[in-house]
Amino acid sequence: MTCILFAHRDAEYFAPKLKQTFPAVKVITAPDLPESVPRFPEADVILAAGHGFNDERLAKARKLKWIHAMTTGFDAIAGSRALGPDVILTTTRGIHGPQMAEMAFLYMLNLARDYPRMHDNQKKHVWQRWTQVRLHGKTVVITGLGLIAEALAPRCKAFGMTVLGVTATPRAVDGFDRMYAYSQLEQAAALADFLVVLTPYSAAMDSLINAKILAAMKPGAFLLNLARGGLCDESALLDALRNKRIAGAGLDVFRTEPLPKQSPFWDMDNVLITAHCSGSSDDNLAMTWPIIETNMRCFLERRQAEMINLVRR
């Protein structure tokens, strides 16, 4: 009997569907990956968020044949030395574009209009006005040209913004005014009013946003990171924020998560923090189930080549 370990906060939603659709499988659930590790030796299949894996955990999964990441990112899995070469890896790529684009706008509007200050004034019953920054006419630079960037670009255009892209292989993409290679990131960053990081994480991309890139940005520019914490040199970012070399940042991801309570980021007036939730939406579950169902059927019927979002390793 195929044993499926579903280690995710939404496992209890999907487990009955799996049992009903595939009655011949055994389903074990856990609220998250750490709590599920003792069950790793039993698992033929693991479904979990893509960022919680490491060599020590994967080494326990001796029967493992397939991992499905309940996220777009899979760097913590694919980069593991303990992952056998024959283990199948799939992701939930394709469902997060609209909500992550909306989160980028939440950051841009809040930072540009200084909404935290407005909200604080409301609580204090203070009537105060200041010059507002509008998005119309501003330049947004987006690193990483996947489905999320393709969802964000037309929304930026609808706001009257100039949209520049940074990617490994520059090419014409609808919604983008101009493309740059990663080797030209410093040049692109100098043009940005908003630099939005959507690049997939890899060792080669670690600290993509570093002191050099931050120094190239305008003093009035904002950095948004919705991808992975490892893409940003956090020490360099803290220095740039403290010394007002950039205007502020919207950060959904960090190198250490949850963000430690003692982190200086928490107390910075020019930083907006969210808890790695930019991909969340009220219809994620409904959009995810068809991917899981299709891939499970393909896996059980040995049609692995037909699985959705199959990662080539």
Task: Please place each PLM-identified region on the residue numbering.
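N-terminal glycine-/charge-rich "phosphate-binding" loop or analogous flexible N-terminal tail
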Residues: 1-45
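Short, well-ordered coil/turn residues at beta-beta hairpins
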Residues: 7, 49, 70, 198-201, ...
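Rossmann-like adenosine-cofactor binding region
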Residues: 54, 170-264
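C-terminal helix-to-coil terminal segments
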Residues: 90-103, 117, 257-313
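Residues forming the Rossmann-fold NAD(P)(H) cofactor-binding site
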Residues: 98, 149-150, 211
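Glycine-rich NAD(P)-binding loop of Rossmann-like domains
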Residues: 118-151, 178-179
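NAD(P)-binding Rossmann-fold cofactor-contacting core
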Residues: 158-175
